[in-house]
Amino acid sequence: MEKTQTPSLTPDELSARSSTPFEEREEEEEVHYVGHLKFSFIFVGLCLSVFQVALSLQDIGWYGSAYLFTDCAFQLVFGRLYSMLPVKIVYLGALLLFEIGSIICATAPNSIALILGRTIAGIGAGGILSGALTILSQSVPRAKVAVFNGILGAVNGIAFICGPLLAGGIINGTTWRWIFYINPIISAPTFFITVFLLKLDPPKTNVKTWRGRIAMLDLPAFTLFLGSILCLILALLWGGKEYSWKNARIIVLFILFGVIMLAFMLVQKRKGDDALVPMRILCQRSIAFGMFFSFCTSGTGFILEYYLPIWLQVIKDLSVISSAVKLLPIIAAAVVFTTLCGILTPVIGHYVPFMIIATMLLSVGMGLLSTLEYTSPIRHVLGFQVPAGVGLGCALQQTLVAAQTILPMNDIPIGVSLIVLAQTLGGTIALSAADTIYTGTLSSSISSRFPQINRETVLTTGNREIRNLVPAESLSVIMDLCNKAIVKTWYLSIGLAAASIIGVLGMEWRRVTPPKK
């Protein structure tokens, strides 16, 4: 079998290499960077592609699960593709798949077609964010990558949080199909900019034949990874809803997830550098601890951004659009500090300080939100969002900067895909756990306090309609129960935010810029 040119470095050797002077590293890699004007257009295109993908994270049920399944599963495949094929071709392929999936959704005659469209769109999404970051790492010097990462992170955050607001406006003004029709419109400039302006050096590899490249994709291992992620997504989708968490189906799915994932890891270890994910990259200290940090902080962010609007809708009886407007403090804080961290990281020379700040402020912000009562004024909600938003802004891009700083150029796509995978899985698993806490607490407490209302009624009632289950004189009681159920989900996010300190402590302190002479 043909071998890649990437040397078989151990995780420790990778760490040692990252301390090599920046001038020497960039000379060794012989990178040819894009001109300023051309890069400006390319960067706008990258922002548009990231924006449309973040907008698509708002789906629920099978539609969202099909998307998340393929998004997670294909992260590693795209990481390997970017490391051995021209980045431009792979990135355009990911964009094309995402748009094909969106068009299928927009024209879907039934639910099956919609699920199929979301599945295809998820495959494309698996390569868009990691592709944008890979293009960045090859378009500007390493010392400047953090700045543009910060801007991309800000765009990603704006799109994710503003998704409900935009979707609500589209649905109120026209058909829901325009939620999907809008994606090809947003993507068109990116596609043409990439085709005509993007020119990058091909990855350094000895694999010249298509047979060798297909072998490097490690399809048997990918099948194992695909199966393990499918078991996990199904268990999270069905658990506590279709079946109880103690049901044999759910238990078997979790066991299968663990067994198949273990088999995948053993195959990766045996295949060395020919693996889909070489263990020397996965076990590299900053990558491993960075994945843990990203898992925890992403989980915290997903819970916050999902249940804070629910609190506003249920407790304060706000519409979807009004509740989205009340999220402006967290949007502003996250956007400003994501960008600011990107600017300051090269100035300070390290990314770890911002990770420390992120852990502290996320924990404080979620702690403050957990003190809310159903009688709390809106101004408390607005104020408590700020430290959490600052923490999210500081956390979003730092582990990606670490991967782009520490790894050799040809390994960056795989390292970035691992970090993005950890972020996606962290949000998926945390939201599922929070949903179990919320629905379980709310249904049991309401059924206990109001015996005439059974559990199934609570679970099938919309968030804003819960207040209609009881007479007006009992409204304060049910609002108190709803508040306590939502606050319990924030206890989980406090735990995740606090646990992220483990990831911080494990990170290497490596410079992102050359030391001043």
UniProtKB/Swiss-Prot annotation:
Protein origin, superkingdom: Eukaryota
Function: MFS efflux transporter; part of the inp gene cluster that mediates the biosynthesis of fellutamide B, a mycotoxin that acts as a proteasome inhibitor. In the first step of fellutabmide B biosynthesis inpC activates 3-hydroxydodecanoic acid to generate 3-hydroxydodecanoyl-AMP that is then loaded onto the T0 domain of inpB. The 3-hydroxydodecanoyl-S-phosphopantetheinyl-T0 is sequentially extended with L-Asn and L-Gln by the two CAT modules of inpB. The linear lipodipeptide from inpB is then transferred onto inpA for the addition of the third amino acid, L-Leu.
Family matches, as Gene3D superfamilies: MFS general substrate transporter like domains (1.20.1250.20)
Gene null: resulting phenotype: Does not affect production of fellutamides.
Family that this chain belongs to: Belongs to the major facilitator superfamily.
Coiled coil: none
Annotated organism of origin: Emericella nidulans (strain FGSC A4 / ATCC 38163 / CBS 112.46 / NRRL 194 / M139) (Aspergillus nidulans)
Keyword terms of this UniProt record: Cell membrane, Glycoprotein, Membrane, Transmembrane, Transmembrane helix, Transport
GO term, biological process aspect, one: transmembrane transport
Subcellular locations according to the entry: Cell membrane
CC per GO annotation: plasma membrane
Induction text: Expression is positively regulated by the secondary metabolism cross-pathway regulator scpR.
Topology in the lipid bilayer: Multi-pass membrane protein
Region (Disordered): 1-24
Transmembrane stretches, start-end: 37-57, 59-79, 89-109, 112-132, 151-171, 178-198, 219-239, 247-267, 292-312, 328-348, 352-372, 381-401, 412-432, 485-505
Record-level Gene Ontology MF annotations: transmembrane transporter activity
The name this protein goes by in its record: MFS efflux transporter inpD
Glycan-carrying positions: N172
